[in-house]
């Protein structure tokens, strides 16, 4: 069996790993491609300690982000219901639709919290009434808020 060489990746490499990962690769692949193209560099005990420290800092940062998202989720869910006023036609049908931008603006006005609109998932809203929307605050944290669409 061929000996493997341990390298640290500088860039994300398909099917190999992400930047900062320590991976075992064939010596020829490392010497002829990864290292000359500055995609990776060889590991030493000092480099391994640095990588471990960096990974621990990243883990701590992810934990803090998740805790912040959980706090934001509880704040959003304690508000209860967000009201959005739309122009209404016949049979309580609204003109246009409720957009993620409108919901984000209403949330910001009522709670003062900034939310990324790309994480908002709205159902098809065509009439006045009550609807549930999902807001992805973190890959592992999803808040569910209630929207009340009213006519004005």
Swiss-Prot record:
Keyword Ribonucleoprotein among record annotations: yes
Listed SUPFAM superfamilies: L9 N-domain-like, Ribosomal protein L9 C-domain
Pfam families, per database record: Ribosomal_L9_C (PF03948), Ribosomal_L9_N (PF01281)
Record key words, sorted: Ribonucleoprotein, Ribosomal protein, RNA-binding, rRNA-binding
First and last residue of the signal peptide: none
Superkingdom assignment: Bacteria
Any GO molecular function: rRNA binding
Keyword Ribonucleoprotein (UniProt): yes
Gene Ontology biological process: translation
Functional summary from the UniProt entry: Binds to the 23S rRNA.
NCBIfam families, per database record: L9
Sequence similarity: Belongs to the bacterial ribosomal protein bL9 family.
Name of this chain's protein: Large ribosomal subunit protein bL9
Organism of derivation: Trichodesmium erythraeum (strain IMS101)
Gene name of the record: rplI
């Amino acid at each position: 069996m061929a000996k493997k060489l341990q390298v640290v990746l500088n860039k994300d490499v398909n099917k190999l790993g992400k930047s900062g990962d320590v991976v075992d690769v064939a010596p020829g692949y490392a010497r002829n491609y990864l290292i000359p193209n500055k995609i990776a560099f060889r590991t030493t005990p000092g480099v391994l300690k640095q990588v471990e420290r960096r990974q621990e800092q990243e883990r701590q940062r992810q934990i803090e982000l998740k805790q912040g998202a959980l706090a934001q989720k509880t704040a959003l869910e304690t508000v209860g219901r967000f009201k959005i006023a739309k122009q209404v036609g016949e049979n309580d049908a609204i003109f246009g639709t409720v957009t993620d931008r409108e919901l984000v603006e209403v949330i910001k006005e009522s709670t003062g919290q900034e939310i990324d609109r790309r994480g908002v998932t709205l159902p098809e809203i065509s009439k006045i009434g009550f609807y549930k929307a999902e807001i992805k605050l973190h890959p592992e944290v999803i808040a569910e808020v209630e929207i009340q669409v009213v006519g004005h």
